[in-house]
Amino acid sequence: MASLAGWMAIPNQNVYAASKAYVVSFSQALSNEMIAANSGVKVTALCPGYTATKMMDNPDQGATLRIPSGMMMSAKDVAEIGIKACFAGKDIVVPGLANKFTTIITRLFSKSLITKIFGSFYRNNMD
């Protein structure tokens, strides 16, 4: 399980974002190796954004992140999208329109600017 966080550096979430970036990179490389070997094994990195799970109810940091409406997806929807993507042979999938838009932004602007934007979002939306 990867995450949208794997697409960017996030201050105060650096270990989480870095570990998810590893999962994205590893999954894409492994997917390519499996295809080249004609193994029949499919590897898909599922990169959801905010997902309604118990992790969101009880974050480890002891703080609660206020998520803008429309940004939270159900775990069921995320899982269904991931399963369909895997069977379709996609090596990476980002469920949700807002999340896809976020990945586009991360490729259009400098990493420095993206880090500032998402760092500011986290600082301003933590209770």
What are these regions (language model features)?
Residues 3:
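Residue(s) in the substrate-gating loop at a strand-loop-helix junction
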Residues 16, 24:
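Catalytic tyrosine of NAD(P)H-dependent dehydrogenase/reductases that use a Tyr as the general acid/base
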Residues 19:
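Active-site helix of classical SDR
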Residues 27-33:
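Alpha-helical segments that scaffold the active site and NAD(P)H-binding pocket
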Residues 33-98, 108, 112, 116:
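SDR active-site lid
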